[in-house]
Amino acid sequence: MPEKRIIIIAGPNGAGKTTFAREYLPVEVGITTFINADLIAVGLSPFAPELAARRAGRLMLEEIDRCGAAGISFAFETTLSGKAYVHRISSWQSLGYSVKLVFLQLRSVEQAMAPDVIARRFKAGLSNFEVLYRPLVNEWQTIDNGRPTPRLLSEGGRP
């Protein structure tokens, strides 16, 4: 039976999470189920996805929970600016999942997309990665995605 895996693609807004995932997930790790609130919002409201952002976020969490309960390997993207996945990670691991976190870094907040809110999320996401999430997951990587070609900065994990 193949290993059940969850890949979390994380990083600040504008770090290129979706672009990175499109290549990395199917080619590098063989995962084709990618859950993304932004893409869900576009499906719900193609001409004004921002109007569907809240609903898309709820649907994303429902789909994450559905895949986890069904034993399906999957991936999703997040800024990690909140603590929504802390308890889920332990739950997934108790269900036999291996959880990998790939954090895409930018050299500075200026490389991210916009001002205030993104600056706060940029700092919160990096802090949450280091303090909350990195100690929980089975594997982690940080990747410099502020260059034309992503570059591995560090990696680690626990059994």
Predicted regions located by residue number:
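Pre-Walker A (Motif I) flank of P-loop NTPase domains
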Residues: P2-I7, A70-I72
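Conserved GTP-binding G-domain of TRAFAC-class P-loop NTPases and closely related GTPase folds
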Residues: A10, S108-P159
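Walker A (P-loop) phosphate-binding loop of P-loop NTPases
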Residues: G14
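Conserved lysine of the Walker
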Residues: K17
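Conserved substrate/cofactor phosphate-moiety recognition/catalytic segment
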Residues: A21-I72
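Conserved nucleotide-binding/hydrolysis micro-motifs of P-loop NTPases
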Residues: V27, L39-A41, S81-G82, Q105-V109, ...
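Conserved beta-strand scaffold positions in the cores of enzyme catalytic domains, especially
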Residues: F34, V99-L101, W140-T142
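Glycine-rich phosphate-binding loop used to anchor ATP phosphates in small-molecule kinases
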Residues: R55-L106, R121-F122
